[in-house]
Design a protein with these regions (language model features):
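Acidic two-metal-ion nuclease catalytic site recognized across multiple nuclease folds
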Residues: 1-2, 167-242
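Conserved non-catalytic scaffold segment of RNase H-like nuclease domains
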Residues: 2-117, 130-152
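Acidic, Mg2+-coordinating catalytic module of metal-dependent nucleases/exonucleases
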Residues: 86-106, 130-132, 136-198, 919-921
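Conserved pre-motif I regulatory segment
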Residues: 232-293
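Conserved coupling segment at the C-terminus of the helicase ATP-binding
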Residues: 233-235, 245-250, 284-295, 368-429, ...
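A substrate-engagement module of RecA-like helicase motors
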Residues: 316-462
Length: 957
């Protein structure tokens, strides 16, 4: 039972604004009083603020000037409220706002400063409920079954917050003793007295509700994920089938039916997977590779997964294996472009396939180790926080507390489960800097809680393994060695047009002068530390002479690094000055120039000298340890640091090498007091690397995209993928027919605007105003414009338009504007858009490739044709490379890439547009450019473009 002597006054205020000192005042007060885990009393009143309530506050809260006109002033209720709050603990959802605002209101009327204990529910839910999608009051309540009918009504918000408080009390009281013991050293970091009361609640410990396993310092959930997705019903007695070549494939079962287009796909794709692969010219056999192109949103993923699994089932039956029983090997391996799409595929497509087939499917998501919690690294980092509390940031401490709680709950260790706010980049950089053991060491130390290693092991016997392209490219040989990519497996590459980009990114090697300087400084400290040990202890050992060579290399490294900075400054001083006045951020360095650049040679000499220091320092440290001069812990620490330095140095050595296959992307920042330089060494073309990957994989591969039609029409399959012999399945026209025509009684309306020039004729500020004019006009049509998507090609223009909208919109309306900016969690952005009753989404055109939106959108705005900027280092490198081949950059790369991006936009529009959705292009090159006929080829036939005035859009119904 929770202690009964304390009364918690759970407070919520509604105010005219956020700052008391700026003249804002209270307009409504709600207090819910909690004792013994129950709401025992309430206090609620409107307050007359002696001023007009801003219109946006009325829209947000529903509180009007008329409503508060006869309400008491604050001073009229102050004494009663002061007495009600005496001897209570003040609780609020964001205590910093409500407590301070109320305190200043009291003091303004002669009361002393409040000295109540304070408890904040925001910090508690962030740490105690680490997997919650949102910590906003309304969204958290909705997700956890707490009634909140009138959000932004003070008493309703206060009562809801009271129930959150009770949830937190219960969760703390049911924690395992070992878990709370790990949290206790960090409780003083919580705001006010929040941590003190958490400790008080734990005194009434009830014992954990779930079993747990304690492997110090972590309390872990012994329930392991079994990785099976279960169907709505078992068996195929009621199933209906279609014939696909020699295969019988289920087309309807347990409430799931293949759509007509999916059936057509299955009839082509299932035989491809079933028949023996060959790369010969034998016409009776299917090639090893096939390409499938169909529009986004037709659920082609269900068609190809069912095709692959059905082919495997049929083969199993013919060899005598029991249908539906995995033979101990992976059946289907799917790679998609992003981690978000991996999880969407699992949640949506695999569940549909499971229902259709009437059997469970073991499905494992594989992604990089850093996507899973690594307990060895986390343990070391938390130990650092405990040992050095003076330098520990509150942010890092509270994230660590949340992770302790989460580890008691998670079955997978997948960081995707966590609220995005816990995926702080700086925090995880600090964690990932810690060393860890080998794969076998991790398994031996943590057993089933070596989460990444467990996923790899489980993948070997999975029905479906879902990868992302980065993992596929980096680990394909590991997947072959681990018997996941076998001859019997069936590989599907979704969003395959992104695969060459992934290979290109995976091959990038980076040299950052700041990191090199910091590493060299740290190595110098290590040299001096070891030298001090040698001198202080008058050591005469064989390794002493190595210190001379280390010191010599140290000086050589510093000299060459300084020379590198000076040479960069001399070479790029003028260019960097002009760069301040342009949008250029970096320089393209062609391979022939990179080869002879004196600054590259200096950088290479610097890191070469650093590399020569590592091995001697290890030898010296080992001998000092063997002599008892260094403790085991100190020796292991030095060894771990040197290994980290060596890993970075090898990358820098690779970066500073010259090769005809690589160019450099050079970024120079000439500050007043220092110069920072970044060199990214990049591939000119990824074709040979990608071809090597495909040749190594022993099984059939289906490559899928909505953007392949234009690639094939330009004969670019071989240049992009290195594949010559392949099957081709195109369903683009069938896709558009299904999405745009079926179920509609009219063509899709598309518009150009008479009022404006084509957007490419304006500068950025002018373009932002044009876009804002259009969006503002659409937004005023509240009857038909509920959801609006605006596609940008430039983030800079997107930010400029966002600023323009902020100047024009009310605070309430501006709250409906969702902007991609630099958010890493696109999934959360998509959910925010989908869950809103009205919303405007500003996103770069590529946003749609990483996220499948289910929300029905009423207007799609194309601000500018999705061409890549031609003067970036990457595009300049393409121009150089194509020129060397005698090809044309615009015709062979820029235009096809733009058409592929445009196809993606049209596909998403077809997939997520409402019944009466409209399309607006502010770029008139769509119809007037010399290449307009090629654009017309990728536009849906059902899209009917016409020219109108801006004001006519207000009357669209």
């Amino acid at each position: 039972m929770l202690e009964v002597t304390t009364t918690y006054a759970v407070l919520d205020l509604e105010t005219t604004g956020s700052t008391y000192d700026n003249g804002d005042r209270i307009i409504q007060i709600g207090v819910a009083f909690v004792q013994n885990g129950q709401v025992v009393d309430q206090f609620a009143t409107d307050i007359f603020p002696n001023q007009e309530i801003p219109r946006e506050i009325t829209k947000l809260t529903g509180i009007t000037n008329e409503q508060v006109k006869r309400a008491p002033k604050f001073e009229a209720v102050a004494e009663f409220l002061w007495q009600k709050l005496s001897n209570t603990v003040i609780v609020a959802h964001n205590i910093g706002f409500d407590y301070k605002f109320l305190d200043k209101s009291f003091q303004a009327h002669g009361y002393p400063a409040m000295t109540h204990d304070r408890v904040d529910t925001v910090e508690m839910v962030r740490t105690l409920f680490p997997t919650a999608d949102s910590y906003k009051l309304g969204e958290f309540c909705l997700a956890h079954g707490i009634q909140l009918e009138n959000a932004h009504t003070a008493i309703d918000d206060a009562v809801a917050t009271a129930h959150i408080l009770i949830m937190c009390q219960e969760k703390v009281a049911t924690m395992p003793v070992e878990l709370f013991a790990q949290l206790q050293p960090f409780l003083h970091y919580f705001i006010g007295q929040t941590g003190d009361y958490m400790a008080l609640w734990f005194k009434d410990h009830k014992g954990p509700k779930r079993p747990y396993e304690y492997i110090a310092p972590f309390v872990l959930n012994p329930k392991s994920a079994n990785f099976h997705i279960f169907p709505a019903g078992f068996g195929t007695k009621e199933a209906s089938y279609l014939q696909a070549g020699d295969l019988k494939v289920i087309e309807a079962n347990h409430g799931v039916s293949l759509a007509p287009l999916q059936k057509i796909m299955v009839k082509d794709v299932a035989p491809f997977f079933y028949e023996q692969a060959t790369t010969s010219t034998d016409t009776n056999k299917r090639p090893k590779y096939a390409f499938l192109t169909a529009n986004a949103g037709v659920v082609k993923s269900l068609a190809y997964v069912v095709s692959a699994l059905s082919a495997d089932d049929t083969a199993s039956q013919q060899t005598g294996a029991k249908s539906g029983v995995n033979n101990g090997q992976t059946q289907v391996v799917i790679s998609t472009s992003t981690v978000i799409l991996q999880h969407q595929f699992l949640d949506k497509t695999v569940q549909l396939a499971t229902n259709l087939l009437g059997k469970p499917l073991k499905t494992v998501i594989l992604k990089g180790q850093n996507h899973f919690i690594q307990l060895t690294k986390l343990q070391k980092y938390i130990q650092q926080l405990k040992q050095h509390p003076e330098s520990a940031l509150k942010r890092d401490v509270l994230i660590s507390v949340a992770l302790f709680v989460w580890l008691h709950e998670t079955e997978t260790g997948d960081l995707h489960e966590l609220n995005p706010g816990l995926n702080n980049e700086l925090y995880w950089q600090n964690v990932n800097r810690q060393s860890k053991g080998s794969r076998n060491d991790e398994i031996q130390r943590w057993a089933d809680y070596a989460f990444y290693e467990r996923h790899v092991t489980e993948a070997k016997s999975a029905d479906i393994v879902i990868l992302n392209h980065a993992y596929f490219v980096y680990h394909y040989q590991d997947l072959i060695d681990q018997a996941i990519l076998t001859e019997e497996a069936k590989v599907i590459i979704d969003e395959c047009h992104q695969l060459p980009v992934t290979v290109h990114q995976q091959q990038i090697k980076t040299f950052q002068s700041k990191e090199v300087e910091e590493t060299l400084t740290a190595m110098e400290r290590t040299v001096h530390r070891l030298m001090d040990k040698v001198v202080t202890n008058n050591v005469k050992i064989q390794a002493v002479d190595k210190l001379y060579h280390v010191e010599k290399n140290l000086q050589e490294a510093w000299g060459n690094l300084d020379r590198f900075i000076d040479q960069i400054s001399d070479r790029f001083q003028t260019k960097s000055y002009y760069q301040r006045h342009t949008a250029q951020k970096s320089y393209y360095i062609a391979n022939d120039y990179y080869l002879v650049a004196n600054w590259r040679e200096s950088a290479q000499k610097a890191v070469t000298a650093m590399s020569k220091m590592v091995s001697p320092l290890k030898v010296i440290a080992r001998q000092l340890y063997q002599m008892g001069i260094l403790s085991k812990r100190a020796y292991q620490q030095i060894l771990g640091q040197l290994n980290q330095y060596d890993y970075a140095i090898q990358i820098w050595l690779e970066t500073t090498k010259s090769s005809e296959n690589y160019y450099a992307d050079l970024q120079v920042n000439l500050g007043k007091h220092n110069v920072q330089v970044t060199i990214d060494r990049k591939l000119y073309t990824s074709q040979s690397h990608l071809a090597a990957i495909f040749q190594a994989i022993p099984c059939k591969m289906l490559l899928v995209s909505a953007s392949l039609e234009i690639v094939r029409s330009k004969n670019m399959i071989q240049s992009l993928f290195g594949i010559e012999d392949f099957a081709w399945y195109s369903f683009m026209e069938d896709s558009y027919t299904q999405q745009f025509v079926q179920g509609r009684n009219h063509q899709v309306r598309g518009y150009y605007l008479k009022d404006f020039l084509s957007i490419d004729k304006y500068n950025e500020d002018q373009a932002a105003m044009v876009i804002a004019d259009l969006v503002e006009t659409l937004w005023t049509n509240r009857k038909t414009m509920r959801k609006i998507q605006v596609f940008f090609q430039s983030r800079s223009l997107m930010r400029a338009t966002q600023f323009e909208m902020k100047q024009r919109m009310t605070r309430s309306d501006y709250g409906n504007l969702i902007v991609q900016n630099n958010q890493r969690n696109l999934d959360r952005l998509a959910r925010q858009y989908e869950d809103s009753s009205r919303a405007i989404l500003f996103a770069v055109a590529s946003f749609q490739e990483g996220v499948h939106l289910n929300a029905k959108t009423d207007a799609f705005v194309l601000t500018r044709l999705p061409f890549s900027a031609p003067d970036t280092p990457d595009e300049l490198a393409k121009q150089d490379y194509l020129k060397s081949l005698g090809d044309n950059y615009f015709d062979d790369v820029a235009l096809p890439d733009m058409l592929m991006n445009l196809t993606q936009i049209f596909g998403r529009m077809a997939a997520s547009g409402s019944q009466d959705a409209i399309f607006i292009s502010l770029d008139k090159r769509l119809e007037k450019a010399a290449y307009a006929d090629q654009i017309a080829d990728v536009m849906p036939d059902a899209l009917n473009m016409q020219t109108v005035k801006l004001q006519e859009l207000k009357r669209i119904d």
